[in-house]
Curated annotation (Swiss-Prot):
PANTHER family: UDP-N-ACETYLMURAMOYLALANINE--D-GLUTAMATE LIGASE. It comes from the Bacteria. It catalyses: UDP-N-acetyl-alpha-D-muramoyl-L-alanine + D-glutamate + ATP = UDP-N-acetyl-alpha-D-muramoyl-L-alanyl-D-glutamate + ADP + phosphate + H(+). Signal peptide: none annotated. InterPro entries: Mur-like_cat_sf, Mur_ligase_C_dom_sf, Mur_ligase_cen, MurD. One of its GO terms (cellular component) is cytoplasm. It is found in: Cytoplasm. This is UDP-N-acetylmuramoylalanine--D-glutamate ligase. HAMAP family: MurD. GO terms for biological process: cell division; cell wall organization; peptidoglycan biosynthetic process; regulation of cell shape. Its main location: cytoplasm. Cell wall formation. Catalyzes the addition of glutamate to the nucleotide precursor UDP-N-acetylmuramoyl-L-alanine (UMA). Its EC number is 6.3.2.9.
Length: 473
């Protein structure tokens, strides 16, 4: 249900649950259109206190250390216009269920943004892995061609921040990265002009319970999209080729049997082909790995649908700089390269990164283990790794998996990243090594705020050891 200015609802309360980035901007936007807003946040820290001060100056009530319990809402039930919940709160949370049973509107930040921005062309990008790179790359291609195409959503800029901006009326395209958490609460609300599905592998099953539920949530975005782009290289999407709604398919496989189903592929000369016509060479594409070639094809297919010429796309790609923490080379000297792939938060993304490395890398992995199939990860470790250094909550579990797979090279466990880097520095000096790859294959939440903080700390530790100036992103 949309939130609109309505004199009959004057004085009604819009609760915002969670004071993360999306909650902060949802509250600011709602207040800017004349709504009464109360924000509840279960934690308290310096950053939250600063946000609280900013919102209170806008006449928004903010309560920290406030738990999301139904009893807390009871006295407000007749006054509530809507409750905007953080994507981190499961939609089957008992408080949400009780509120909905009483007819209370429970929505997400994206629902609010959509109501404001629905007359603008949206590109909705989802997938287990690759969605951030595709979002960033496609936005870059469009912006380099004089289209106002900001990226937003799960990539870090809340969509309500875009809605709040006075520049929003001038936007040509919104390039939105949408996670399953965001899609789940906004099902049947968002209707993108173009929907892109990058990959699908088991993830977030602690939240979505079953793989089928996870698939349906992702697919709901594509069903709502006017035009769809899929990745035929993804095994699960490929297996569901016939059941998915019609759309454009891409593949990096030059074999005719595969490309018969696809509109974009890579030929044996390393050219992107569009329906049998050569478009552009991959020679100058900077990103490592076959998974990034898939990301490129998805972005190119969308850019072509929007109407950009091959030459315009090619010129935009020449100036593209990759996002940090994604196969990011942070050190290269003599024969040693050190790569930060902190964004590899599950086994599948880790496999993609390891596959992109030539030779036998030293691999650093660890963190909080997610649900997912480790078979291919163990295989690639056995096939390629010169040594494996494990840290954090999952270190012993990962060690057991690797040893059960028959790994014969060095494998060591550590408490944290600092210990790993201290040892790795000495190990590299005493053993000829070409590549040190930070590929966690796990979430960061055992020791870090997010994968970005984890990646920045990894870089800081490396730079301290190698005496290089560190610049955090």
């Amino acid at each position: 249900m949309p939130i609109k200015n309505n004199s009959k609802k004057e004085g009604k309360i819009n609760f915002v649950i969670g004071l993360g980035r999306s909650g902060f901007w949802a509250a600011k936007y709602l207040r800017s259109i004349g709504k009464r807003v109360i924000v509840w946040e279960s934690k308290e820290n310096k950053e939250l206190l600063e946000r609280k001060k900013i919102l209170e100056k806008l006449d928004i009530s903010v309560c920290l250390n406030k738990q999301f319990l139904f009893d807390e809402f009871y006295k407000f039930l007749r006054q509530i216009e809507s409750i905007v919940v953080s994507p981190a709160i499961p939609f089957d949370h008992k408080t949400i269920i009780k509120l909905k049973e009483r007819g209370i509107v429970v929505i997400g930040e994206i629902n609010i943004a959509w109501e404001s921005l629905k007359n603008i062309n949206w590109i909705g990008i989802t997938g287990t892995n690759g969605k951030t790179t595709v979002t960033h790359l496609l936005s870059h291609i469009l912006r380099e061609n004089n289209l106002f195409a900001p990226f937003a959503g799960n990539i870090g800029t809340p969509l309500c921040e875009i809605a709040y901006s006075t520049k929003s009326k001038n936007i040509d395209w919104i390039v939105a990265e949408l996670s399953s958490f965001q899609i789940e609460i906004a099902t049947h609300c968002i209707k993108p002009k173009i929907g892109i599905w990058t990959t699908f592998t088991p993830d977030h099953l602690d939240r979505h319970k079953t793989l089928d539920n996870y698939f349906k949530i992702k697919n709901s975005l594509l069903k709502q999209s006017e035009f769809r782009i899929y990745n035929y290289d993804d095994q699960y999407l490929k297996e569901n080729f016939k059941s998915l709604l019609n759309g454009i398919w891409i593949t990096t496989n030059p074999n005719v049997s595969d490309s018969d189903h696809c509109d974009y592929w890579i030929n044996n000369e390393n050219f992107i082909v569009e329906r049998r016509e050569k478009l552009l060479s991959l020679k100058n594409f900077k990103l490592k790995g076959n998974h990034n070639t898939q990301n490129l094809l998805l972005a190119v297919a969308a850019a072509r649908k929007i109407g950009l010429s091959t030459e315009r796309i090619k010129n935009a790609l020449l100036s593209y700089e990759q996002l940090p923490h994604r196969m990011e080379t942070i050190f290269q000297r003599d024969e040693l390269e050190i790569i930060n792939d902190s964004k590899a938060t599950n086994f599948d993304s880790s496999v993609a990164g390891i596959n992109a490395i030539k030779g036998s890398p030293i691999i650093i992995s660890g963190g909080r283990l997610k649900n997912g199939d480790s078979i291919e990860w163990v295989k690639i470790i056995n096939k390629k790794a010169k040594a494996v250094f494990l840290f954090g909550e999952s270190s012993q579990t990962l060690k057991k998996l690797i040893l059960e797979g028959g790994f014969k090279n060095d494998i060591l466990t550590f408490n944290d990243l600092s210990e790993v880097i201290n040892y790795a520095y000495s190990y590299i000096k005493n053993n000829q090594s070409e590549t040190l790859l930070f590929s966690p294959s796990c979430s960061s939440f055992d020791q870090f705020r997010d994968y970005e903080q984890r990646g920045d700390i990894f870089k800081k530790l490396i730079y301290e050891k190698f005496n290089i100036k560190f610049i955090a992103h």
